Amino acid sequence: MTTEDATTVTGMNPQIVVRRLAAAEGYLELGLPNYALAELNSVTDPGPFAPIAELFRGEALQAQEKYADAIAPLNRAAQLFPAPFNQRALLALSNCYRQDGQTQLADETAAAVEMPPDVTPDTKLIIAPIFHITKNAGGRITKGDN
């Protein structure tokens, strides 16, 4: 049995952790939070990828409408990501506070989000994926590919 075949990732193998996180993000994009959580639960030590794992865990719980449960991982993600990269976590955290009836915390968290000046409150935001998987991801990038 290889390390990759193991159901649970023990120790920090960056390639496997990134693969699991990319799978979790893909499941979230497909609206399958249960599968995303299964991928996240298989990673016992995300190492330096902990902020991403926390963000995805919070988003999966939010998608399951478990807002109170989503608050802790989203809060950790918002703290672990440096500003302005924590905006996605802060937006999700604000929504979870609001859905959980904690309006004051929701407003305070939303106020911490640094939006560009041209974004109005009614603007629909599209959050870009963290991992971008391409069909031909196996090749190396050479100097001429830049």
Where are these regions (language model features)?
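"A position-specific structural signal for the A-helix of alpha-solenoid helical repeats
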Residues: 22, 56, 92, 126-129
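Alpha-helical segment of the N-proximal tetratricopeptide repeat
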Residues: 13-45
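TPR/TPR-like (Sel1-like) alpha-helical repeat modules
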Residues: 74-80, 91-121
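Start-of-helix register in tetratricopeptide repeats
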Residues: 18, 52, 86-88, 122
